[in-house]
Amino acid sequence: MAKYFGTDGIRGEVANSTITVEFTQKLGNAVGSLINQKNYPKFVIVGQDTRSSGGFLKFALVSGLNAAGIDVLDLGVVPTPVVAFMTVKHRAAAGFVITASHNKFTDNGIKLFSSNGFKLDDALEEEVEDMIDGDFIYQPQFKFGSYKILANAIDEYIESIHSRFAKFVNYKGKVVVDCAHGAASHNFEALLDKFGINYVSIASNPDGLNINVGCGATCVSNIKKAVKEQKADLGISLDGDADRIIIVDENGQEIDGDGILNILAQYSDICGGTNGIVGTQMTNMSYENHYRANKIPFIRSKVGDRYVLEDLVKYGYKIGGESSGHVINLNFGTTGDGLFTAIQLLAIFSQAYKPVSEFKLQGELMQQTLINVPLTKKVAREDLQKVASDVNDVEKRLGNRGRVLLRPSGTEPVLRVMVEADDKSLATNEAEYLVEKVKQKLV
């Protein structure tokens, strides 16, 4: 079991968890030392979101890297997918993002990309963790690394997207965008300006403390309200580091990551094509049934965009994602990318002249009830055996009307209890039953 890494990097409350100046410096030094051991290029890229803690954590990371003899190129405040993109483009050994994604501003963390733009696999994470717990290493003969700032990183990213999609995007509707006061602030607007989109921007004034507060992809009520007030045709909401996207239609109705994947699957020729779709254990059964009916291969991965990516590579598919809004298209990038996904959707909406609501899967979706149960410590999968008989009882009662999923969070001491059924009250009642059993046996 990983000591520091969760499903999406390392994350926690600043100064009251792993996320301290001392740890972040050791992490930088550990990765730098590993780069030296493996004879990778002595050069990495770093970026950050808008949290007030991002600056001093970044410089702690840089100092550890520099001490190990690694040169650092700082992109400043940029979306997470921009760091992955630039890591590949500039042939860096690794890319770091100081971010806690959709979490509150008091949290922060580090996402780490390898030279191919993918998040680290479990084996490499274990190597990094072993190095963190070892000695701090200074590069011999004072051959320390350098530190430089690249101010135009977002321009390179925007130009790459524009060169691929300029001929497809001609969207005439009115768009509202919610940047979550995060890394997309001003950067997403620059991308939309490049494509000539008519938009209104909200939650795009970061002050270091307001990231994700009452806005962004985890608070869709903000974008729903704005779409109605602006009488807009489309709403696009990103999270704090812009690797997630949720959209709403002209009626203010939400289309989550599953719904977005379904739209991309229908128009995959515009998005570069794919032989199938990768969803997750959380993907609504209605979409799985829809893909099957339309002879579109569909695979469920474990929850976490790194696992979606692993299955995309394993099965040779190009498009996949999560209900939460992480959407990956390997025809362009290597990680969840809210900005690029938005442009793909605008390209699709430009080609088919109908309201956004008509792109959604028609009919009622299976009803999901998801309850997060706080725990005193992280729960291992083997701990779930304590409630296995209770889960089995619920599955028997549901029969073919639904399913059950218990999933430990990869980033916090929380157990997610999800029940899906063709009736909302049935899903809710069974989920609440399981929550009580979890509280009795695991809390």
Curated annotation (Swiss-Prot):
Activated by phosphorylation. Keywords: Isomerase, Magnesium, Metal-binding, Phosphoprotein. Gene3D superfamilies: Alpha-D-Glucose-1,6-Bisphosphate, subunit A, domain 3, Alpha-D-phosphohexomutase, C-terminal domain. Mg(2+) binds at S101, D239, D241, D243. The modification Phosphoserine is found at S101. Its EC number is 5.4.2.10. It comes from the Bacteria. SUPFAM superfamilies: Phosphoglucomutase, C-terminal domain, Phosphoglucomutase, first 3 domains. This is Phosphoglucosamine mutase. It comes from Francisella tularensis subsp. holarctica (strain LVS).
